[in-house]
A protein has these predicted regions:
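Structural/interface elements that position substrates and couple domains in central-metabolism enzymes
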Residues: 1-425
Length: 425
């Protein structure tokens, strides 16, 4: 059987995967954002995950049976595919409840073109049971086909690390699964054909779903632990980073650093597992405690900065502060669920005027998402305080002394500045 793949959703997860598959198979990348499609077909990836030459190296001008990637927002272009890989976001709502709307919508799209023998693979991070209990019924309803008789499903959780040019998609081992043992093997072989790091075939879709959601929950809890340590050691006037460095000399000490936990994965996925646990009558203690602690860190950083400013005799109301970075992580333009926003809002509550400088973030995106003004140009003014919130590579070469007033405060959230900061986590 000739394999033809449709990748639904061309964001940070879908595009690198579609590009990789396109080196071996005919691939149609589908996204409802027409501007995104136009950019990609011109060889421009706004997420900066794929460079122009690499992207143009796989692009083709039409949906055919030739190897390569064709990007489209027209549903007819995916109707001849036999593998559908769904890579849409799985966010939470304002009450931190899972929002499966993107999954439902993409399942409806696939259902409209689903044929006998097709396989639908989900990569979006979900709680155990979503694929078979939430997505499959949508596929059956829209297509009129019967699951595991007419069409089949798989689940292979994404492990993309945005901004990481070392651990790219083909270099990260892939967990795979299928709705039957035979389909599991077929899904596994498909990924194995392009993932050089290898694959791990899980015994069921639910096992694969659970594996992914605990990867991120474990990381969230570990960061919450060191964030709590940072609060304690700050009260004891001990350098947290020095403590972690000393403790890290033991071979089995886990290397985590304190910080703001944002983005579309670590700060979101634990809520998916918590929701499923609560549905079954169990209240997760550690998972939600970790979330509460990590969500409190933005306000904590702001309060620490203000205390340092007061100690230096700086008038808080009307003070000028430079925030370095707004994205959720370094060397990446992604501003989804960034916790720098919590710091900015908390500082503004004190009456501090915050200027946000980030060479990676799109000002229009930040304005749309958070109603905040950012600049890609380094300001020429001097400030009462500077907060390094994101460890972009550009920030390590800036002479911050020229931007800071003589008695100004420098706070290093990430612990990366060579010069002596007045405070850090």
């Amino acid at each position: 059987m000739n394999i033809k793949i449709a990748v639904i959703g061309l964001g940070y997860v879908g595009l690198p995967l579609a590009r990789l598959f396109a080196t071996k198979y005919p691939v149609v990348g589908f996204d409802i954002n027409q501007n995104r499609i136009q950019e990609l077909n011109a060889g421009n990836d706004a997420t900066l995950e794929i460079d122009e030459s690499t992207l143009k190296g796989v692009l083709v001008s039409s949906s055919s049976n030739a190897n390569g990637l064709y990007c489209s927002s027209t549903i007819e272009d995916i109707q001849n595919c036999n593998y559908y890989i769904v890579t849409v976001p799985t966010p939470v709502d304002k009450n931190n409840r899972p929002d499966l709307t993107p999954l439902y919508k993409s399942s409806e799209t696939v259902g409209k073109v689903l044929k006998k023998g097709d396989i639908v693979i989900y990569e979006s991070t979900v709680y155990p049971g979503v694929t078979e209990e939430e997505c499959i019924p949508v596929l059956e309803r829209v297509s009129g086909l019967k699951f595991n008789v007419d069409f089949f499903a798989g689940y292979s959780p994404e492990r993309i690390n945005p901004g990481d040019k070392e651990h790219t998609v083909e270099k990260i081992l892939k967990v795979t699964s299928g709705s039957t043992p035979e389909i599991g093997q077929r899904v596994n072989e498909l990924y194995k054909s392009v993932i050089t790091a290898g694959t791990h075939l899980a015994p069921s879709i639910k096992v694969a779903e659970a594996a992914k959601v605990i990867e991120n929950s474990q990381r969230d809890i570990n960061i919450a632990f060191v964030n709590e340590l940072a609060k304690i050691f700050n009260l004891l006037e001990i350098d947290t980073h020095a403590v972690l460095e000393a403790a890290g000399t033991k071979w089995n000490f886990l290397p985590f650093k304190p910080g703001l936990v944002g983005g579309h994965c670590i700060g979101v996925d634990p809520y998916y597992l918590a929701q499923k646990a609560q549905e079954k009558g169990y209240h997760p203690e550690i998972i939600l405690a970790g979330r509460r602690l990590n969500d409190s860190m933005g306000e904590y950083v702001a309060s620490q900065v203000v205390k340092l400013m007061i100690k230096k005799g700086i008038t808080i109301n009307g003070a000028q502060l430079l925030m370095l970075g707004i994205t959720f992580k370094e060397n990446c333009p992604d501003v989804r669920n960034t916790k720098i926003v919590d710091v900015v809002h908390a500082l503004a509550d004190y009456g501090i005027q915050v200027t946000i400088f980030d060479p990676w973030a799109k000002p229009s995106e930040v304005a749309h998402e958070y109603k905040l003004t950012t600049t890609n140009e380094l300001p020429s003014a001097t400030f009462d305080a500077i907060v390094l919130g994101v460890a972009h590579k550009e920030f390590t070469t800036i002479d911050l002394s020229k931007l800071k007033k003589s008695n100004g405060v420098l706070f290093d959230v990430k612990g990366v500045l060579n010069e002596k900061a007045d405070g850090r986590l």
